[in-house]
Design a protein with these regions (language model features):
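Hydrophobic helical h-region of N-terminal Sec-dependent signal peptides
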Residues: 12-16
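Bacterial N-terminal signal peptides that target proteins for export
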Residues: 1-10
Length: 286
């Protein structure tokens, strides 16, 4: 498989201890540079080592959405490089068309509808379904908006509930955010949706960002590790850093933003489950 784009992964220090099984924080940001230069960065913040491995999947792979007859079946149209947490769920990846998908924690997610009989799609393979089937954000939005399947989200091996939302970007700079609210899929689609973190729901994050934009990033920025603060900082810096069509400049620029929103190693706040150490970062030159 010839990948026309680059997927770079920088892993944090190896885990020295296993923290209590509470979930985490993450940040995703898309760099929109000149001459179509698009780079997507992401941090993985988790209170324990998620045992991430990288896999190269070829096009033409037959897949199923869950271990049940009442599921979704497909054959991958695109090869991809994917990151798997605990070797059971795809959290991050890029396909050969340059489409990037990032799965981040969102505890408010509700996938279930009463009496839902649609085919099952496991949350652990939802990201890979997108990477397998779509070359652009437009394609992903058009198909996923039909809501042909229901998401099944079993607990993680450490007992944590799987409550996540998905961000997708493509080489044109287009983006979409997919969230499940009360069993319904809500989609935010457009180049302006460059950043995603965690709680609260995305429309509330945008309202918080609007407040800080009135203040101005050069005047003051929120500095904690909380998801809304990281959202504001990433939104400011991803547009404030130098813009260049040269990947040797653009990629380090995105990595510098990812470092700014990373959580120092060893940080664990028992009463604030969204503050966890950054385990690794990815930067995708699309």
């Amino acid at each position: 498989m010839l990948m026309k784009t680059q997927f770079l992964t920088v892993f944090g220090a190896a885990a020295l201890a296993v923290f209590p099984a509470e979930p985490e924080a993450c940040t995703r940001a898309v760099y929109l540079g000149p001459d179509g230069m698009t780079v997507t960065g992401r941090t993985m913040d988790w209170r324990e080592d998620p045992l991430t491995n990288l896999y190269i999947f070829p096009r033409g792979t037959a897949r199923r959405g869950a271990n049940t007859d009442d599921t979704v079946f497909w054959t991958s149209k695109y090869g991809s490089l994917s990151a798997a947490g605990y070797d059971i769920g795809i959290t991050d990846g890029m396909n050969e068309a340059g489409l990037v998908a990032n799965l981040l924690f969102l505890p408010e997610s509700v996938y279930e509808r009463p009496g839902d009989t649609r085919p099952v799609m496991g949350l652990s393979i939802w990201t890979q379904y997108v990477l397998d089937n779509f070359a652009t954000v437009d394609e992903a939005v058009a198909e996923l908006s039909k809501e042909k399947f229901r998401i099944d989200a079993p607990d993680l091996p450490n007992g944590v509930q799987s409550r996540l939302h998905l961000a997708v970007s493509d080489p044109s700079g287009d983006s979409a955010i997919f969230e499940y609210i009360d069993g319904r899929l809500v989609i935010h689609h457009g180049r302006q949706y460059q950043v995603m973190t965690n709680s609260p729901f995305y429309d509330q994050q945008l309202a918080i960002l609007d407040y800080w934009q009135q203040i101005g990033g050069l005047t003051m920025l929120p500095g904690t590790n909380r998801a809304p603060d990281r959202f504001v900082r990433a939104s400011f810096y991803i547009n404030a850093v130098v813009k260049s069509p040269d990947p040797k400049i653009a990629v380090p620029a995105v990595m510098s933003v990812m470092r700014n929103v990373s959580v120092p190693y060893g940080i664990s706040t028992p009463d604030k489950p969204h503050i966890s150490s950054t385990r690794w970062r990815t930067v995708c030159d699309q």
